[in-house]
Amino acid sequence: MNTELKLCQLLLAGVLLAGTCAARDLSTINPPFPRIGNCYGAGLGSKTWEEGSNYWSKLSLIIGGGYALSYDWEQPHWPKKLAKVEENIARLRQVNPHVLVLPYVDVVESSDDPAVPKHWWALKNGERWSGWPGKFRINTALTEVLQFNLDKVRTEICGRECFDGVFYDVWGPDDWLVPRTAELRDGKAVVMLNDGSLPRKGFASLNGVLAEDEINRVIDGKVDFEDFLARYLRWTRESRKPVVTMIVCRPQNINNDPSYWHKLNWKERQAICERARASDDKTMRLGLATALMGDGYFGYDAGTSERGTWWWYREYDAPLGHPHGPARRNADGTWQRDFDGGTVVVNGTLFDVVAELRAKSRDVSTGRVGTRFTLPSFDGRIFLPTDEPATTAADVAPRVTAKPPETLRVAKLDNGVIAVQTPGGLELRFDREAKLRHVIWRSQPLLTGGWPLARIQSSREFHSDSISGGVAEASDGEVKLTFSGTLGAESQRVAFTETCVVKPDNRFTLRFDFTAATDLDLRVWRHDFALPVARYANAAVSTDAKRVTLPAALKDESLLPSAKHVTIETGDTTLNMESSVGWSLVDHRKYGTDEYLLTGYPVRGAVKQGTQWSVEISITVAAKRAAN
C-alpha cells in the first residue's frame, strides 16, 4: 500500500510539474527597435508595480531582475520575493507581451554558505579562493555540481511559467550544462550566458550571449571594432530564436574595480551613479548604434559592480520600428541600417567622418536637421526623417581624419584623449589616465599597450590615484607629452613619471620612471604590447638570436624568449623596437584573446620603499621596402 501511495504521489507531482512547465509561445516575440534591456537591476522582486511599471513597460529584455541565484536556492526570503516577481511579471505581460525575463544563475561561485557541500569548493593551495568580493569559487569540474544546477533550473525556473528561460553568468558554451539546459521545455527554453566576450561557438544551443563591456574594450583599443561587430552580427543571425544577444557597456570615466565598489555604502554608490549618468553619452550612443546593426538588445549602466541602473536616454525612445534589411558597410568604414522610422549610422573607426543621408533628417542626439552630419570616432547616431527646416549653422568640423597632416599635429578628442599625428601616417592616442590606447599606422590599428599591468599578492590591481600632465612641448621637430601621478592598490603606492617623445619620421620613445612610495609585495608588474592576430598572423618576428613566423593557429604559448631588440615585419610594414628591458613573445589566444603579446617584467616580488626603476621603449614604424 505504501508503495502504491508513493507511486501515486510521484505521478501527481509529475502532472503538476508538467503543468507549471508549460511555456508561452515565443515564436511571435518581435519587439520594435531600439530593444532596451536591463542586466540584474530591474527589481521585479523588490519594487511594487506602482514603483516600477513605467520603467519595466519600456524594456524588451530583463536579466535577473529580482530572481538571482548563487547556490542559495533555499533562502527563506525567496518565497515572498518570488511571489512579487510572479505578480509583477503577470501584470507586465499584459502591457508588454514582448518582454523576455531570464532569471540569473551563478554556477561558478557562492557566498560562504554552509549549505554548499564542502567538497564542492574550488581550492588553491588547500584554501578556498575568491574571484569576486564576498564570493568563493565552486569546483565546476564536478559533474554533480553541474547536475545540481541543471536540476534547479529545471524545477525552480523552467517549472515556473512566468520565466522564459535562464541566464548563466560567468559561463561559456560548454558541452554539458548548456546543451542539457537547451533541451528543457521540449527544447524551447531560452538560454543565455555571459562569457565575458562574444564567443565564437555555441550557436546551436544558445539564444544569445551578453557582450559585457566589450564596447569599452573597443574604445580602449583592446578589441577591434570590425571583429566585434562581425561576432555580434553572427550571434543575432545564427543563434536559436528568439535572439537575446545583448550589448551592455558603461561610461569610460567610471571606476570599474569591484574592490573599490565593495567598500562603498549605498549612498556613496548612488552618488557615483548619478554623476556618471550623463557623463559619457558618446559611449552610450556607440553601444546603442552598434546593437542596432543587428537584432539584439542594449543596456547602458554603471558597470559590473552596479549593473542595471535605471538610466534612460532620448535615443531609446526613437520610433525606429523594424529594419528593412541587414546593416551595410559604407566606403568610409561606417555601418548603416535603415528602419521603418529612420536610419542608424555607427562610426567604429578611429577617425571622424561626415555621414551623408539621402533624405533630410533630424539627429535625435543633437537636434540638428540636414543631410550631412559630422560623426565623431567611436560614436553613433539615430536619424529620423523630418519636414523641419534645415539647421543653418555649420556642423562641427572633423577633428582627426585618416589623411595625415603636413607637419606634426596634436589634437584633443573626447574624454581627455590626446592624439599626436605624424606626416608619415603614424598616430598615437593617450587617454586621460596617461595610457597609450592606440598606435595607428596609415589609418589602421597597429598595436596597443606600454602601460603597466600590476597587481599585489592579493590580486588587487594598481589603479591611478591621481594623474596630471599632457602636452609639454610641440614643434615641427617633435611633440613631447609628460604625465605624472600615483598608482595604488590597497595600501601600496607607486609614484611615476611618464614621457613620450614623437618624431616626424614615425618614431616615438615611451619612458616610465617609477618610485616605490611604500613597501611593495608584487604578484606581477608587467608591461606589454598587444599585436592583433588578424593583422600579424604569418608576420616575421626576429631578435638578435632568433627568428619566427607568427602562427595563424594557436600552437605553442611561448614564441620568443626575452630580448631587448625586436623587429616585426608584416604586410607592407616594419616595426623596430629597442627597450631597456627584455621582451618575450607569447600567443595570448591560450588565455582567450586574439592577440600575440610582447611582455616585459622590470620588477617582481618584494620591493622596498624608495626603490626606483625605469622602462624605456623606442619604436620606429616604416613602410617595408618591396623586394627587387
List each model region and its residues:
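Acidic (Asp/Glu-rich), glycine- and aromatic
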Residues: 494, 507-547
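Short, exposed beta-strand/loop patches in secreted or surface proteins that constitute
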Residues: 326-328, 335-336, 408-412, 418-420, ...
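N-terminal secretory signal peptides that target proteins for export/translocation
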Residues: 1-5
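Bacterial N-terminal signal peptides
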Residues: 8-19
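Glycan-processing catalytic domains of CAZymes
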Residues: 24-396
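Extended, loop-rich substrate-binding clefts of extracytoplasmic carbohydrate-active enzymes
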Residues: 455-517, 521
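Beta-strand-rich N-terminal accessory domains
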Residues: 395-460, 556, 563-574, 579, ...
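Beta-strand-rich recognition/accessory modules
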Residues: 421, 446-463, 486-488, 521, ...
